[in-house]
Amino acid sequence: MKERFSPLFEPLTLPNGSQLDNRFVLSPMVTNSSTKDGYVTQDDVSYALRRAASAPLQITGAAYVDPYGQLFEYGFSVTKDADISGLKELAQAMKAKGAKAVLQLTHAGRFASHALTKYGFVYGPSYMQLRSPQPHEVKPLTGQQIEELIAAYAQATRRAIQAGFDGVEVSSAQRLLIQTFFSTFSNKRTDSYGCQTLFNRSKLTLAVLQAVQQVINQEAPDGFIFGFRATPEETRGNDIGYSIDEFLQLMDWVLNIAKLDYLAIASWGRHVFRNTVRSPGPYYGRRVNQVVRDYLRNKLPVMATGGMNTPDKAIEALAHADFIGVSTPFVVDPEFAHKIKEGCEESIHLRIRPADLKSLAIPQASFKDIVPLMDYGESLPKESRTLFRSLTHNYKEIK
């Protein structure tokens, strides 16, 4: 291994005592290869098993906690006890080489495009009329529905424990439902979850995390990992949905009620790990990851994500993070981290051919609705993205 990459292979201990032998994380990647009813398939299991040695901490693609929160047509569910057996197989595959397996819990809110197809509307904090992907309404969640949603996260955590996962991650990133309650762009409510105060906007985040923590305290084995994924600011030009200062205040409140083991920073765009603060204030222009990590230093490990598709970018990102979440490179080269460790980084292959799909355990029908997100991030070469785009034509034949 080249000396400059050695920090990537230093061990890390999470707050709960879990030991990781390097700084790589297999970050969430939805393959869209489950059943329409949200059950894990053998394709999902085989894909996970092929990457079981990729990183010591592995996080699943999004598992939806409520039918109205389903983003992807062939994503997997954690909404019912019948999901547990398939999730158990998935967890076992992820853990086959000693990795820690974490189930990501999500509700896509107004972006729950498959729920929109099924029900004709979606839910959010406040009423909206949207035009994409077709004209539709966003209905505001009632107080009772919010309570049911909080309970759904708790039940999903219970199922993750029963399925044998080593942890759960609650995602509030990239305009998923929890984040939209925190943002003044989307939260126009006037009740106790409304936009009148920062604390009110934070209430759903805090309530969900507290409910998850309660289940962990009561039912999880020692060393169970509790992660949180979030976007530290939301801006549109000069308009602010929430600032990084407000996010840091949220994290103070979060750490008072939840024993988190990491914060994963996520957002949209290319090279997210290089994002700089856009909200006015003392942090303006500094790297987002640096600001958040400095604030949380000695309190909570911070994970960088987004765009680290070379060893040089990985080590650059680690300068302002405790570990790094890699997604698309592990799709096409499960040995990405191993090759860096062995000093063989020139043999990393991000450009793949149809003949490679079988050895990579990539399902023949996969990545439907995911390729446009890959296009946006551009972490993979165009040739690989074009190949994945061709797989989306196989759904009618196979599914």
Curated annotation (Swiss-Prot):
**Enzyme Commission numbers on file:** 1.-.-.-
* Keyword NAD included in the entry's annotation: yes
Give the main EC class.
Answer: oxidoreductase
Q: Keywords assigned by UniProt?
A: FAD, Flavoprotein, NAD, Oxidoreductase
Q: Which domain of life is it from?
A: Bacteria
Q: What GO MF terms are annotated?
A: FMN binding; oxidoreductase activity
Subunit architecture: Directly interacts with lipoylated GcvH-L (SpyM50867).
Q: Which family does it belong to?
A: Belongs to the NADH:flavin oxidoreductase/NADH oxidase family.
Quote the protein name from its UniProt record.
Uncharacterized oxidoreductase SpyM50865
Could you tell me which species this protein originates from? Answer: Streptococcus pyogenes serotype M5 (strain Manfredo)
Upper lineage is: Bacteria, Bacillati, Bacillota, Bacilli, Lactobacillales
